[in-house]
Amino acid sequence: MSSCALAAVLWTGCGSGEQKPQVSATDDFAVMTEALDKGAGAPDSLGFVWQTEQFADIKIIRYQVPGWEKLTPNQQALVYCLNQAGLSGRDIMWDQNNRYNLRIRALLEGIYQEFKGDKSTHGWHRFETYLKRVWFSNGIHHHYSSVKIQPEFTRAYFDFLLKETGLTASEELMSVIFDPKVEPKKVEQDASKGLVESSSINFYAPDVTTEEAIAYYESIADSSRTPVEIGLNSRLVKNAAGAIEEQPYRVGGLYGSALEKVVYWLGEAIQYAENPKQATALQNLIDYYRTGDLALWQLYNINWVKDTEGVVDYINGFVEVYNDPLGYTGSYESIVQIKDFDASARMEKLMANAQWFEDGMPILPQHRKKKVVGITYNVVNVAGEAGDASPSTPIGVNLPNSNWIRVVHGSKSVSLGNIVEAYDKAGGSGLLEEFANDAEEVRLAEAHGDLAGKLHTALHEVIGHASGMLEPGVAETKATLKEYSSTIEEGRADLVALYYMMDPKLVELGLMGSLDVGRAEYDSYIRNGMMLQLRRLEMGADIEEAHMRNRAWVSQWCFEKGQAAGVIVREVRDGKTYLDVRDYEALRGLFGQLLQEVQRIKSQGDYAAAKALVDGYGVKVDPKLHQEVLDRSAKLGIAPYGGFINPWMEATRDASGKITGVTLNYPDDFAGQMLRYSQDYHFLPNEN
C-alpha cells in the first residue's frame, strides 16, 4: 500500500476528499497493525532515489546539482557563503508566517527528540506527520492554501507526550495548536472579513486594522518616478500613543540577530566574488540589511540586474509579497544558483526577440513598452534554498518586482532547471491518463509536454512579467489592485505565455518543432485550471492561492466566452468529466482578448474590474466537480504538492581560513535536515 493510500485510512488524506479516517483519533495509543509505507520512490538507473517519502498531501524530493565539479574552488566557496547567508535567515520566514511559529516549532521538535516511548502507535505517527507538515510549511499554516493545519492526534495524546518528555506548553499555545478558530488562516483575501484583522501573518500587530494599515501606507506613498517599495521590509505596529509605525527588518532592529549572520556570510561571499559588479551588488545588499533603507534596496536591485557575467547568482531578501493581504511586505527568501550554459543558450532567442514579442502583443498601444531593455534569461541549477523558497520552491523567477527598475534597468529571469528535472523524475504516473480527454491528448502530452512546460515558464518569466507598462500617474499595482494584485500579475504573465505558445514565431526561432507543442500546453493548462488543480483543495474550500486563482479565472473565462462556439467542450462519459479543446486558434484568440483586458486593468489600476474578474471566475468551486476530482485522484495515490531536501555543503579551508573547496552531498532524510537547520541556524528568539 502506498503511503497516500495508507493515509486514506489514517488521515483526512492526500489533498483531502477521501472519507474521514476509519481509525478514530481516540485510539492514538493503539499500535498500528499495518506496516507503514513511507512512499519512497524506486532508485533510478544510477541508483539515485528522487522521492524519499510521502505524507499527507506532500511528497519529499531530492535534487542534484549538475556541473558542481566544474566550478572553480572560488566559485564553490561563493556558493557556500551565499547558501550560509540564506540559511542564516530562515527563522525570519517562520516568524513572518505567524508570531507563534518559532515557539511551536521548538515545542514540537523538543517532543520529537526527547520522547522515548512507543513510536509504533497511531498517535505517534499522527504527531510525526503533523510536525513534518509544519516543517514543510515553515509554520502552522498550509504553505499553499494558508489554512491552519489541524493535528489529527487528540489533545489528550499531546498532553501525554508533554508529560513523557517533561515539556510544558501554555494554554495560549495549546489553543493555537488545537482550536480551529484561533489563528485560522495565514492570508485572508476576502475583504468583507477584514484583510488584516483575519490574517494570521505576522506583518501586522494584532491590534492593527485594515483601515489603519491602508491609511498609513497611503500617507507615506512615494509618488516620484522612482518610488521605493514602501512597507517591503517592516512590520506595522502601534506605538504607546496609539499611532501606526514601522518596525524595520534590519541589523539592530526587528530580526536583527539573524540578519547579523546573513550580513556576515554576505561579507564572506564578497572575497570570492567573480567580478566587481557582483561584489558591488553584495555590498549594497549588506548596507541595506544594516540600515533597512529601501533606497539602498533599490540600488542593490539596479546593480544586481547589471551583474550578468558570472556563473553563480543568487536571490536574497524580502522579495515576494504574496503573503501580505495588502501586498506590501516581502517574505524572506534565498536561492543560490549556477548557470546552465547549454540550456541557457537554447533560450537566448527569447531575449534577443523581446521587442518583437512586446510589439506583437494584443494589448492597447499605450500599454506597450516602446523600448524593452535589459532582459536577462538563464536556465540555472539550484545549489541551495531557504526561507520562502524552501522546502516548497518556485520553478521560475523574474525580478526585481519594482516596475520602474524593470522599465529603466531591466530584469533577470531564471528557470530552475534541476528543480524541474527533479519534479519530473519524482512525478507519479496516472494523472494524465485519468484526466486527459482522449488518446490524442495523451499522445500530445507525452510527446511535447516537457518542452511545452519549459517554454511556458520561459515565456511567463522572460516576456510576460517584463512586458507592458502603467499609464502615467497610475500608482504601483499593490496600491491600486490591492488584494488582487498578485493573481492579476501572475495571470497576465500566463496569458502572455499562452498567447505566444501557438505563434509560428516559436517554430521559426527553432524553440519548438511544431505548433503541437502549443496544443499540448493549451490542453494541459485548461485541464489543470478547470479540474486537476482542485485536488489540492479540501472539499468545500474556496481557491485562495494567487497562482491557483489565476489558472482558474483564465481557464473559466475562456471556457465561458468560447462556450457558444464550442471552443472548449465539457463532456461526461461513464460518470467522469473531461475537457476537450476543439479549436486551438480560437482559444488563442480568447487568451489574447483576456490579455488585453488584464493589461488594461493593471495599466489603469482598475480595482473594480480586477475584483469582478477574479471573484467571478477564480474563487468559487463547483462542489460536484470538486468531489469527482478528489475521488478520481485519490485512487492514484499521488501527492499534489512536492518539496525538497537541499544538498549539504562542507567547506575545507587552508591555514589562513580561506575556503579551498566545498564538497556536496545529497541527504535523504527530511526530518534530519529540518532538525539540523534548527540546531545550526536558529538565530532568532522564539518571540519577536
Predicted regions and their residues:
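Post-HEXXH active-site segment of zinc metalloproteases
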Residues: 468-491
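C-terminal motif of bacterial Sec signal peptides marking the signal peptidase cleavage site
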Residues: 10-13
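Bacterial signal peptide processing site
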Residues: 15-18
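Contiguous, non-catalytic segments that form substrate-binding/exosite surfaces or channel walls
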Residues: 126-238, 242-442, 449
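Long, well-structured alpha-helical subdomains associated
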Residues: 93, 498-601
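Extended, compositionally biased alpha-helical segments that mediate assembly or anchoring
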Residues: 215, 583-688
